[in-house]
């Protein structure tokens, strides 16, 4: 297998297991991983997106916070932009999403982990992301919200975000919860990373 064959095999396996969305990323979001320039991210992701688009009828998501990567991925067949910085890292990405009229997943994240009232602060941060979307011309029906489990949160805060995830529905958008293999699952259930599929 080359990398493309491996990715296509994995996508097929996930779809057979019931996946609704195939999320493709060219930069690891795990703690401690290095920044990847947009050009390299594009080289890594576009062949995979094109390959999946040719073979499968499914929603393809591009996991990026970079406008240049999002633009190339949409052109290649992605219909969802999964931005782990909630439109706050690249000023142009909201415009790319608005112009293409694709869906976007706005994840909660922040560089500062000091919260006064955790849920209130998290919702205020997500509200800022939604305002950036609105200003760019992204309609509410294009938006999915993600509480960002595993990002800028303690174990206790992650568990609170999971337990109170229903509160995010007050924004009037669907909510996506990504917990599989995250460290909060490992710490809560005392499991190694390869045994965390309960997430």
Predicted regions, residues:
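Phosphate/pyrophosphate-binding loops at sites that engage ATP/ADP/AMP, CoA/4′-phosphopantetheine
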Residues: 15-16, 20, 127-142
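Residues at or immediately flanking beta-strands
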Residues: 59-61, 142-144
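Active-site-adjacent loop and "lid" segments of alpha/beta metabolic enzymes
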Residues: 1-10, 29-51, 56-57, 64-67, ...
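Residue-level marker of intrinsically disordered, low-complexity segments enriched
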Residues: 19-22, 50, 60
């Amino acid at each position: 297998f080359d990398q493309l064959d491996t990715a296509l095999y994995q996508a097929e396996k996930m779809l057979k297991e019931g996946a609704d969305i195939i999320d493709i990323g060219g930069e690891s979001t795990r703690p401690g991983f290095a920044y990847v320039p947009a050009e390299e991210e594009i080289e890594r992701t576009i062949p995979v997106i094109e390959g999946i688009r040719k073979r499968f009828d499914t929603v393809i998501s591009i996991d990026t916070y970079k406008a240049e990567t999002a633009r190339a991925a949409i052109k290649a067949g992605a219909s969802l932009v999964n931005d782990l910085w909630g439109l706050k890292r690249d000023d142009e990405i909201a415009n790319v999403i608005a112009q293409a009229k694709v869906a976007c997943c706005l994840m909660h994240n922040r560089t500062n982990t000091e919260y006064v009232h955790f849920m209130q602060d998290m919702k205020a941060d997500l509200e800022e992301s939604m305002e950036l979307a609105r200003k760019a011309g992204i309609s509410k029906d294009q938006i999915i919200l993600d509480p960002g489990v595993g990002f800028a949160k303690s174990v206790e805060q992650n568990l609170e975000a999971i337990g109170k995830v229903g509160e995010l529905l007050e924004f009037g958008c669907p909510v996506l919860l990504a917990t599989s293999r995250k460290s909060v699952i490992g710490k809560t259930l005392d499991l190694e990373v390869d045994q965390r599929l309960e997430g």
